[in-house]
Amino acid sequence: MQVNKALIRDDSVKNMNKSSAPLSSQVVPLILLTGIFFLNFISRIILAPLMPTIENDLGIGHGEAGALFFLISLGYFAALMGSGFFSYHLTHRKTIILSSMVSGAALFAISISHTMWGIRLGLLIVGMAAGIYLPSGLSTLTSLVRSRDWGKAIAIHEMAPNFGFVVAPLLSEILLIWFSWRYILILLGVVSVSSGLAFACFGRGGKFPGEYPRPGILRVLMVDPSFWIMVALFSLGIGASIGIYSILPLYLVAERGMLRSWANYLVAISRISVLGIAFLSGVVTDRLGPKVAMGGVFLGTGLATFLLGVVPQSWIVLIVFLQPMMAACFFPPGFSALSRIGPPRVRNISLSFTYPLAFLLGGGAIPAGIGALGEMGFFDLGISLVGGIVMSGLILLHYLQLPEE
């Protein structure tokens, strides 16, 4: 066991891929990776703004429509946990290209399918294609850029999903003026395939294999306290961002008495401010280190989330804008810390197991718990409790051990 652990932890940051370089020299591959991640993310959420049109066109109800989102999530998390098998046999670079190509092909297949089973299968494949990207994308990114610039590089990469939240509804509304939802999926599929070809021609890095979850590696991870601490920290980070985002419109309408249209508009525009603040978090991460940066994030996010449940009505709009800005700051230091656990070859394993487990807790259990308290008449208490739980991340950080930079 000690030999295996030494293998996994051996100079995780110092023995970086020889291509590691300053961030300024890796702008083109970083932009390509961020663009692929953006398309990867938007392909999973584009159905949300298109769904009213899709329901009318296919003659399905809300329940069946909701099941379509479940299929995307099922494919995503299954592929994410098994992504190591792809990167082990193909290398990270080819896995990224495969993700873009298959996602684009699946979107095209959905657009021409006229049976529900064909659409369901296509959405499952879209989720799976998206799921194999993230571990390989981050492994490639951290192999290209020197460790002192990881925070900024990851912050740029993490702009993709935040930008996707803003672009998806706007893009859908604009294109629906001229095209049906099927042509929108075709367009997105073509752009996705094109991004894969662009990375194949102009992208760099990732020319090394990942590791698949072999019993020996899994055994080392499962007994490593840092792995479980990172699962807990990511659960808190995801819970404060996606978890609160999922339940916030309902809270604003049911507990704060807002009109539904105003609540949805407020939540949507509050995401715009997140785009720039994440990069600032990356700069702080590079200057102070991921542990210090995460400490500030958990304190600020926990306090903002707590206030979301207790401030008077006159302050609620300000807090709705402040809370996601603080929550988005978690991911640059969070992924930077996670990327320091293990050498480049095995980093994808920690990510492919940390993120799904954390999402189930932060993105599933936390909003479900808030909703349950809301049913009992304690909606505001549920929100504030999450704020207190997020601040407990400060205690966990004390026990997190990261390799020296």
Feature map (PLM): residue ranges:
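A late C-terminal transmembrane helix in Major Facilitator Superfamily
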Residues: R345-M376
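Helix-loop-helix hairpin linking two adjacent transmembrane segments in secondary transporters
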Residues: H157-A200
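Helix-to-loop junctions at the C-terminal end of transmembrane segments
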Residues: A79-T91, A278-G289, G374
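Juxtamembrane intracellular "pre-TM" segments in multi-pass secondary transporters
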Residues: N15-L23, G205-M230
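Cytoplasmic helix-loop-helix junction between adjacent transmembrane helices
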Residues: G122-A160
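C-terminal transmembrane helical hairpin of 12-TM major facilitator-type secondary transporters
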Residues: K291-G334
